[in-house]
Curated annotation (Swiss-Prot):
Its cofactor is FAD. It comes from Macaca mulatta. GO terms for cellular component: endoplasmic reticulum membrane. Essential hepatic enzyme that catalyzes the oxygenation of a wide variety of nitrogen- and sulfur-containing compounds including drugs as well as dietary compounds. Plays an important role in the metabolism of trimethylamine (TMA), via the production of trimethylamine N-oxide (TMAO) metabolite. TMA is generated by the action of gut microbiota using dietary precursors such as choline, choline containing compounds, betaine or L-carnitine. By regulating TMAO concentration, FMO3 directly impacts both platelet responsiveness and rate of thrombus formation. This is Flavin-containing monooxygenase 3. It comes from the Eukaryota. Keywords: Endoplasmic reticulum, FAD, Flavoprotein, Membrane, Microsome, Monooxygenase, NADP, Oxidoreductase, Phosphoprotein, Transmembrane, Transmembrane helix. InterPro entries: FAD/NAD-bd_sf, Flavin_mOase, Flavin_mOase-like, Flavin_mOase_3, FMO-like. Pfam families: FMO-like (PF00743). Belongs to the FMO family. The lineage of its organism: Eukaryota, Metazoa, Chordata, Craniata, Vertebrata. The modification Phosphoserine is found at S401. FAD binds at G9, A10, G11, V12, S13, E32, L40, W41, N61, S62.
Length: 532
């Protein structure tokens, strides 16, 4: 076998990393704190220290055709947006199919990862683990950090004057599991992210009253998009990305605002982001607008201060008789087992080349997998990250110099601040990022060549959904079934809907979807020219 690689965590990122190491002839050992795979997607009735935690009703925000491993589609009958138990079922099937379980040491806690004294020449690491009260250390040639960034809750109590006097319950959203215990209660949810909106809408059916407090607002999107298709299969396309990144800023901003307000006017619902043209990651919630319309959820600005039983908001209004405050305020980015000098933090910005490699080490033998966010799905992202990292560790791919990596990081961060704002340092442009990683590995689809040699496939690749299968079409790790998977992705998407067949299946034409916003301006210009 090849170099020994320690993989920390057996969630989505960890499984992808084990598989990528095996593809490159490396020797992986995965350490998992719990007794099962799945990470974030493994539901537990109670939140465990040092592990990601989800509530019982969590569903995916990405559809199944956009969030699979590129050579392992979901079963045809799986719904497009899946309950967490379905994801766990899929990950278990993937791990068994790829024979990954034998490389995982369960119930093993990684307490420290340190450079060896000769790191500058060997790039090796001392990894210390604990299991059943026993402490062990081992030497590894490389480390892949796959422990996620939804572990340590951010609970900024000091930002809310008077909270220490509040007499009701107060906790972070990671401790929320199900709505039954809140029957008849008055609940304040602080934070307008995915968790905050999910919890608020779920509680609205059992609680007496639910209020969401938001400091800066958010775009709220539905999973169901034009003509009832999954949102990401309509919007995440290469053609759409080309338009977004090449149109004049004013037109691009107009298109973005029109897209975000397609379902309802955010201003009317008190949800409009403070800076609407920033491409901050939207919230996905199909119920929130209806809950606001029905009066069972209200949206308020930031909390100015708390009293013993109420919250006073920045607009002077008050929510009285609060029984419980749930802080859906995100997570802190930290790796307790690593020295701070290894993965540096600058103004809430983790310094990593392409979101994976610390740029200032003598040897690039540690990689962070899964530490980016985008409108795209996590599984195909970590698949590409881990494939690239494994090839760098093996020596097949090389990284630029420290100076070039830092210049790239600084340039990308300036662009991120422009597009997403300074608070969204993990955010990235999905297709642009995936194409960068795939070009490093040699698996990026050659679109012009596809149009010449396989126009049917090229049309689907460029104008259709940028699905994960595209990154197993060519190059290392090529999957023979990738072409067919792309051409049949709509069939699998529509299959679970056909429980009552009433006509021929209708597949969308996405070229016209992107031209639709320009139809009225073009028509008006034509009328004007005709009149003159």
């Amino acid at each position: 076998m090849g170099k020994k690689v320690a993989i920390i965590g057996a969630g989505v990122s960890g499984l992808a990393s084990i598989r990528s190491c095996l593809e490159e002839g490396l020797e992986p050992t995965c350490f998992e704190k719990s007794n099962d795979i799945g990470g974030l997607w493994k539901f537990s009735d109670h939140a465990e220290e040092g592990r990601a935690s989800i509530y019982k009703s969590v569903f995916t925000n990405s559809s199944k055709e956009m969030m699979c491993f590129p050579d392992f589609p979901y079963p045809d009958d799986f719904p497009n947006f899946m309950h967490n138990s379905k994801i766990q079922e899929y990950l278990t099937a993937f791990a068994k199919e790829k024979s990954l379980l034998k490389y995982i040491q369960f119930k093993t806690f990684v307490s420290s990862v340190n450079k060896r004294p000769d790191f500058a020449t060997t790039g090796q690491w001392d990894v210390t683990t604990e299991r059943d009260g026993k402490r062990e250390s081992a030497v590894f040639d490389a480390v892949m950090v796959c422990s996620g960034h939804h572990v340590y809750p951010n609970l900024p109590k000091e930002s809310f004057p008077g909270l220490n006097h509040f007499k009701g319950k107060c906790f972070h959203s990671r401790d929320y599991k199900e709505p039954g215990v809140f029957k008849g209660k008055r609940v304040l949810v602080v934070g307008l992210g995915n968790s905050g909106c999910d919890i608020a809408t779920e509680l609205s059916h059992t609680a007496e009253q639910v209020v969401i407090s938001s400091r800066s607002g958010s775009w709220v999107m539905s999973r169901v998009w034009d003509n009832g298709y999954p949102w990401d299969m309509v919007l995440i396309t290469r053609f759409g990305t080309f338009l977004k990144n090449n149109l004049p800023t004013a037109i691009s901003d107009w298109l973005y605002m029109k897209q975000m307000n397609a379902r309802f006017k955010h201003e009317n619902y008190g949800l409009m982001p403070l800076n609407g043209v920033l491409r901050k990651e939207p919230v996905f919630n199909d119920e929130l607008p209806a809950c606001i319309l029905c009066g069972i959820v209200s949206v308020k600005p930031n909390v100015k201060k708390f009293t013993e039983t109420s919250a006073i908001f920045e607009d002077g209004t008050t929510f009285e008789g609060i029984d419980c405050v749930i802080f859906a305020t995100g997570y802190s980015y930290t790796y307790t087992f690593l020295d701070e000098s290894i993965i540096k933090n600058r103004n809430n910005e983790i310094i990593l080349f392409k979101g994976v490699f610390p740029p200032l080490l003598e040897k690039s033998t540690i990689a962070v997998i899964g530490f980016v966010q985008s409108l795209g799905a996590a599984i195909p992202t970590v698949d590409l990250q881990s494939r690239w990292a494994a090839r760098v560790i093996k020596g097949t791919c090389t990284l630029p110099s420290m100076e070039d990596m830092m210049n790239d990081i600084n340039e990308k961060m300036e662009r991120k601040h422009k597009w997403y704002g300074k608070s969204e340092t993990l955010q990235t442009d999905y297709i642009v990022y995936m194409d960068e990683l795939s070009s490093f590995i040699g698996v990026k689809p050659n679109i012009p060549w596809l149009f010449l040699t396989d126009p049917k496939l090229a049309m689907e690749v460029y104008f259709g959904p940028c699905s994960p299968y595209q990154f197993r079409l060519v190059g290392p790790g090529k999957w023979p079934g990738a072409r067919n998977a792309i051409l049949t992705q709509w069939d699998r998407s529509l299959k679970p809907l056909q429980t009552r067949v009433v006509g021929r299946l209708q597949k969308p034409c996405f070229f016209f979807h992107w031209l639709k916003p320009f139809a009225i301006p073009i028509l008006l210009i034509a009328v004007f020219l005709g009149l003159t």
